[in-house]
Amino acid sequence: MSRYRGSVCRQCRRENMKLFLKGDRCFSDKCSFDRRSYPPGQHGQRRMKHSDYGIQLREKQKVRRIYGIGEKQFRIIFKKADSLKGITGETLLSLLERRLDNVVFRLGFTSSRTQGRHFVRHNHFTVNGKKVNIPSYIIKAGDVVELKEKSKKVQAITDSLDTVVRRGVPQWLELDKDGFKGVVKGMPAREDITLPIQEQLIVELYSK
């Protein structure tokens, strides 16, 4: 899957919201979005009118960027959500939240989803005592996500855990900070996902 290699701060400005792609920097006064909260480019400060399709497309792109997922993989996740019982849009967000790279970020082990993806791939975590190095692995209720013994001294992880109080942990997860592990207490409900996402726009886009 191809990866965006430009400035991640430009992505926040493009979507007109903080995507929290740079960890602690997003919470500091160094955040580019706080200083320039308008789209990048020569005409960024002009007000643009979008068609219904354009609005739907922007919403999909925003969610893709939040979770760091390419178009092909995002479409696969949407099809899975559409095939399951329940409201498609809410199921889509639940699947995205339950990705392992997102869960380790939500638990506070990493400062961003990008860093979470990196550490998962490099075998820093186990799920129910077994090695899992696939960022897209879908976590289930009752699963225990634990940091490997050798990884407990990784500075980036300990630094991130020190800021977890400020960021907070969702109600569907429980962090044992001293034990370097987290428990999935249940499935994420729609109200647990506080990002300004209009998932119905994505459903409408893919229904065309």
From Swiss-Prot:
Family of this protein: Belongs to the universal ribosomal protein uS4 family.
InterPro entries: Ribosomal_uS4, Ribosomal_uS4_bac-type, Ribosomal_uS4_N, S4_RNA-bd, S4_RNA-bd_sf
Gene3D superfamilies to which the protein is assigned, alphabetical: Ribosomal Protein S4 Delta 41, Chain A, domain 1, RNA-binding S4 domain
UniProt function note: One of the primary rRNA binding proteins, it binds directly to 16S rRNA where it nucleates assembly of the body of the 30S subunit.
Record GO terms (molecular function): rRNA binding; structural constituent of ribosome
Gene, per the UniProt record: rpsD
Alphabetic keyword roster: Ribonucleoprotein, Ribosomal protein, RNA-binding, rRNA-binding
GO BP term, pick one: translation
Phylogenetic lineage: Bacteria, Pseudomonadati, Thermodesulfobacteriota, Desulfobacteria, Desulfobacterales
Pfam families: Ribosomal_S4, S4
Name the record gives this protein: Small ribosomal subunit protein uS4
PANTHER family associated with the record: 30S 40S RIBOSOMAL PROTEIN, SMALL RIBOSOMAL SUBUNIT PROTEIN US4M
One of the record's GO cellular component terms: small ribosomal subunit
Domain S4 RNA-binding intervals: 98-168
Record text on subunit structure and interactions: Part of the 30S ribosomal subunit. Contacts protein S5. The interaction surface between S4 and S5 is involved in control of translational fidelity.
